């Protein structure tokens, strides 16, 4: 069964996974460090502005579901938190370093193309090329793995499909398809209107030119 998270819980888990790999000497994280990580302006989509209270509420919910643990030492004045989202002794979700990097990046930044994921996971995992990213995505998207990610319809004007995690609930592909079609329709309508406007301007210029020629001829 796939874990289902709220957007704030997804941000908390993503930050804990990220900092576990990129700043291991500062991990587990204090509430202040975790809040700062959640509100980072770089490598986050969308950018959030969460209070410590909001982050703590999410952490408490995750602790109750055994997805986060408080690793504070005895008599410690500051609580320190680490994720138990994957690769725990008794947990069901086991991810390779590459899978973990991709999932982390998606939790922090939402839908992304394989090319974007390869670039953005460079501190989390190593991929030889985009093809290797696609291979890992295919595994994560398989029914055997519980369809942890899903391939989205190609957006109008784009060459690559984006992939989205399903830890915040099952992705409505029909809604994405409808949105893409509406965008394409709006773009086509805008193009038609623009062409019609340009054609009208050309006709007006032709008319003005004809009038100027007529005026010049009358003066000769």
UniProtKB/Swiss-Prot annotation:
SUPFAM superfamilies: Winged helix' DNA-binding domain (SSF46785). It comes from the Bacteria. Pfam families: DUF480 (PF04337). InterPro entries: DUF480, WH-like_DNA-bd_sf, WH_DNA-bd_sf. Signal peptide: none annotated. Belongs to the UPF0502 family. This is UPF0502 protein VVA1225. It comes from Vibrio vulnificus (strain YJ016).
